[in-house]
Amino acid sequence: MRPPGLMPSAWACDGHGPVAPLRTWTKVGPDLLALQAGRVDVPLWCPLPLLPGWTVTGLAVAGDERAGGRATALALSGPSPLGGPADLVLVAEELGTGLGGRTAGTMALDPGVSVSTAPDAKVQAAGHPTPLWLVDSAEDRVAVAGEAGGVWLWAVLWPPAAVLLLLEHVELHDLRHETHAGMTLPVGAPTSRL
């Protein structure tokens, strides 16, 4: 990873070219959520109401002050439907950003979703039915992706059986919306997933 300089003026990766710098936070409170929600150009998705026992465990934003936030990731933890703990990271990103692929454990910049088959899961995103398809991921997790709000939406879950959470009626809300200003969400132990 090379920092910006006079030429080029963007962060750069030898394998991917220009990339958006990534900032992560493991202590997420209402002030931080409100501040970052006001700085990003893509949705900051959160399932509301939270599933019973679920907490917010981290936040990541890819982008800089000049270009704005090109991707967001909100990490949550709670009980898995089959017992034990589970983690969920919701990523919203512009085309070619790569945060979703990184979270899924692949080198993919975009999910490469094939919509020629029936979706593997469905959620409500900002009140709109949103189909999601299984995409490539590392073996220790499962990832689904689709389009919501004009950008990619990824849901990455650990362990893979936690994908059963998406069989529930999941409503994703964009925390950038003014109705969510000042909302206090339960905060859990910091995540290692970001």
Model-derived regions, located:
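Short, solvent-exposed coil/turn segments at beta-strand boundaries
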Residues: 51-53, 80-83, 147-152
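A short, solvent-exposed beta-edge/loop patch
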Residues: 116-194
